[in-house]
Structure formats: structure tokens, C-alpha cells
From Swiss-Prot:
GO biological process entries: translation
Keywords: Methylation, Ribonucleoprotein, Ribosomal protein, RNA-binding, rRNA-binding, tRNA-binding
PANTHER family: 30S RIBOSOMAL PROTEIN S12 FAMILY MEMBER (PTHR11652)
Pfam families on file: Ribosom_S12_S23
Gene of this entry: rpsL
Annotated NCBIfam families: rpsL_bact
GO cellular component: small ribosomal subunit
Keyword Acetylation among UniProt keywords: no
Protein name: Small ribosomal subunit protein uS12
Amino acid sequence: MPTINQLVRRPRKPSVSANKAPALQHNPQKRAVCVKVYTTTPKKPNSALRKVARVRIAGYGSEVIAYIPGEGHNLQEHSVVLIRGGRVKDLPGVRYHIVRGALDTKGVQGRKKARSKYGVKRGS
């Protein structure tokens, strides 16, 4: 434990937390272009075919893996998408989500609940 004199000479440093979504460069969302759309399997003990896309961020050039939420999608290579932060716990390396219903991404067909999260208009 430091003395008060030591703290006067050299104050405590505030701990700096690491950025969880560095590719967004402190923006809430960024536009990106799909490079590859594919499925991948989650870590143990889960089992599924999770839909993901490798995307190149516009005006920045870095490539990241983004998760495609919801059932079914219309994405293919060269689709323009909007990505946001938010990792997928059982997919290592996936730290971004694609925003449904924005740019080239269609909303989830037949969605009735939690519509705002999946880009579905009311009554459709």
C-alpha cells in the first residue's frame, strides 16, 4: 500500500478497458460489403449451423466476421450491409452483428415478436 507522499509523487493510473469492437472506430454502426457468406459451427456444448459473413468495412478496409441474426437471409457476396457491435458467445472471433432491414439486408420473414430487432415493419 503506497504512502500519501508516494501517491502525491505518482498518482494512481485509471485502468483503461480494451475496446470490444475496434473495427467500428467508435461509431455505432458501419457500412460493409460481404466478401463471403457461409455457415459455421459453435463451440461445445452447442450444436448448430450459424450463419455468418466475412465483411470488408467501407472506408477502412479491414475484414471482420459478422453474425447474421434471425431465420433465413438474402445475403450473398457483394451485398452491402450495416454492421453493429455485439459478439456471439459461442462463435469464437465473431464480434459484430449485421443489422437486419438496413441497406441490402431484408428483415426476417413472418416475424411477429421482437420485430424491431429484426427489421420487420408492423402488420407485415
